[in-house]
Amino acid sequence: MSKVKKQPKIEALQNVDITFTNVSYVYSPKTPYEYTSLQDINVVIKPGKITAIIGSTGSGKSTLIQHINGLLIPTTGVVDTNGFIIKAKQKRIKNIKQLRKSIGLVFQFPEYQLFEETIEKDIMFGPVHLGETKEVARENAKKYLEMVGLPLNYLERSPFDLSGGQKRRVAIAGILAMEGNTLILDEPTAGLDPEGEEDFIKLFQRINKEQNKRIILVTHNMDHVLEIADEVIALKEGRVFKVGSPFEIFKDKNLLQELLIEPPKIYHLIYQLQEKGLDLTNVNIRTIDQLAKKIIEHKEQKRKG
């Protein structure tokens, strides 16, 4: 009789890939409403990186990320998610709390999920529910409230007294307080003003750099993808269409047209420069300052002959 494989501890998961092998997912199978959302997905999401998942509406982005922490079970194929193996049509996932603790999922508009009477209790809820002691959860509430940019005197306030952006920070602090190695963000800047968007993007970068936390970002905002992503997974009609760096994705105008995706604003300028004879599509440019520097360098070279 074979021994049951022990599931890994979170602290041992810092360098573990998330792997999809031949994964498909069908909603409402064998009913008139049957719909195939994912088809034959084979992809690896590396640890310690920021990976963006892009695609037009209905391409399967949200379905894909819900397989990562076991909210959905694949119809076919296998998901190795942080060392937890989830197979097609599996009835239950062993040690599901351990999996959920290792992978935090922040849904779109997470502020609507706040419900406790104080911010401290809201941040503590997830860790305590997943087995953490109240003492440790209370200390982590302080730590992660400060990390998301809110002062400690907010702990005793009601979350319902906060602005929309502040509520979102509290919701993210609650996910971070579970201290997993992976943070999944589904349209995390939706509904925010430009300043609020930029604040959150910088926060995600800081979390990635300071904690070596894997971040998986689902977004329609290609400016954000260009700004922070190490790798991009592009989906089309439930299939992986292309995997590459943001530069490999955005330099290909035909690819973006097939995906029905608008390029980042900087790449609109890069395409215009290309039409005028200055091809910068093979240069890794993330910011307008980097673009300006390359244009100046080109002019200097041209002047010198």
UniProtKB/Swiss-Prot annotation:
Topology in the lipid bilayer: Peripheral membrane protein
Xref: SMART domains: AAA (SM00382)
Binding-site positions, ATP: 55-62
Domain of life: Bacteria
Subcellular location: Cell membrane
Pfam families associated with the record: ABC_tran (PF00005)
Start and end residues of each ABC transporter domain: 13-262
Function description: ATP-binding (A) component of a common energy-coupling factor (ECF) ABC-transporter complex. Unlike classic ABC transporters this ECF transporter provides the energy necessary to transport a number of different substrates.
Stated family: Belongs to the ABC transporter superfamily. Energy-coupling factor EcfA family.
Protein's recorded name: Energy-coupling factor transporter ATP-binding protein EcfA2
Organism the protein comes from: Spiroplasma kunkelii
Encoding gene (name): ecfA2
